[in-house]
Amino acid sequence: MTGKPEGGAAIPLRVHDACFTSEVLGSLKCDCADQLALSLDYIAGPGAPGLVIYLQQEGRGIGLANKIAAYALQEGGLDTVDANRALGLPDDAREYSSVAAILADLGIASVRLMTNNPRKFIGLAGYGLEIVERVPIEFPPNPCNARYLRTKKEKLGHLLERV
């Protein structure tokens, strides 16, 4: 967190889910590490306060072991959504009650949410959080993640303009 929220003004918020494969191993199969870096830079910049909440919800909430199993199925031709389904897992298993609790504890009721994911927007709004603006965090696809990002746009409704 940078700065101290005052007067109920909407602060920039990034709710970021762990991505060991990109953030630690440097995988290019997604844009998670890029999104985290951009969010940290944005929030550290002028106009503080801002907040990044980092959650341990690897692989859209299915966990690291299941994510690796899904990667193996993707190498065999399935996309990210169909790979989860083939493993009997949900498309997205993340939940945001802890975020609502953190924000309530900090006295934050209004945010400018940094996301491309409409489910995250809806999930947080469901806890009574006022989201006054969606701040996109998008990068041009690379050869390793273009199919993944296209699938997220087409099957999960992600708000991606460069795909």
For each feature predicted by the language model, list its residue ranges:
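Catalytic domains of riboflavin
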Residues: 1-163
